[in-house]
Amino acid sequence: MSSKAHTALVELREDLDGDVFAPWDPGYDAARAVFNAAVDRRPAVIAQCAHADDVVRAVRFGRALDLNIAVRGGGHSVAGMGTNDAGLVIDLRRLRGVTVDPAAEAVRVEGGATWGRLDRATQPHGLATTGARASTTGVAGSVLGGGSGWLERSCGLAADNLLGVELVTANGDRVRASADENPELFWALHGGGGNFGVATAVTLKLYEVPEFAVALVVYLPEHAREAVRTYREVVASGPLEAGGAVVWRTGAPAGPPLCRVLLTYAGSEEDLRKLAEPLLALPHESQVVTALPYAEAQCAFDAPPGLRHHWSAECLSGAPDDFVDAFCALAETLPVPTATRHTLFPLGGAVADAPADHLVPYRDAAWAVHPFGSWADPADDERCTAWVEEVRAAVRPWSTGAVHLNFVGDEGRDRVRAGLGPHNMWRLGVLKRRYDPDNVFRFNHNIRPL
């Protein structure tokens, strides 16, 4: 480290109310670890910011030393976009405050808070909003990437519920974006991710969700195709409050993959039981139908720490019978025994009803396939990664060509265009030039300045 860099680091330690870690500091390895254990990077400096002013100081520090800058919120990026080698990581995990305004049905969430913290804060008020399907995911990164979750068919995507963003730009300025303040920037933040600055807080619209219930029905492979078709019809004919997923994964402890149909409902257990009757009428191995606090339902798919991950997705125009056959056949090649999941989510409803000017381009998709590779042994890296890509290739005949960027890693510029819409790229590039002309914030699904 040069004398200039050493002096700047000493000054950063003095200036920040949060903590600063360099590779020789105790706690550095714990601070650099991210959700995906396959990502093993060694930043030169980790600035764990305590508040927005710390973020300003960290950005200016990184710019002064010409360091690559990554921004970590929940740390859930499968590609490890919240970290880097030999650069600066601006770590927001200490910015985790959640402030609920029940009268306004709104919540302000700091940039490092997770969905678990938000859900636990809003639940006592009978309120909720669309959030990621894992409670450990960061709110800000999820929302700014679009934000898919159990409530999206009735409440829209997380980005659809965005009321405001507090941002630190590439030159260290603090700005706000909303429908009334910097509206063009606000538009870009409905899916444009971290390209325009560090989100130190977001404000979201809340909805009344006083009751929530789930039905989980497990089927043997020979009954799976009928179960998936039945689930398709239940969702299509049911209320928008109904959602859920089809999830194939290894049977315990290491048996063949089993098909799990999860039917979620933002309403009463009694009403859910009526909706689930066609699924329960099929031959099945086990069933659970119960009322469940929404915050607990959000934890149902939390992956244990320490696993290696690779995942991707395709948005689908529909789920006809030939697709169902192909989807279920792919489960036969699921890497066993691992924690890998082969998932199918329904879209539609409020997702498709957003204004035409909204950024996310997959509004017309009816379903999303999300092969979710998770495993513990590095020896399984190749086969689990290959399986995810095989699923993508196999379902491409039904793909709309669009993709939800929160569901993919670093898959190249064509996938970024597919996730943001080719018709939006010029407009986004112009905004990028205005707010980040040097592409300081490029450890993301990157938009290049024009």
Which residue stretches match the model-derived regions?
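Soluble FAD-dependent oxygen oxidases
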Residues: M1-L450
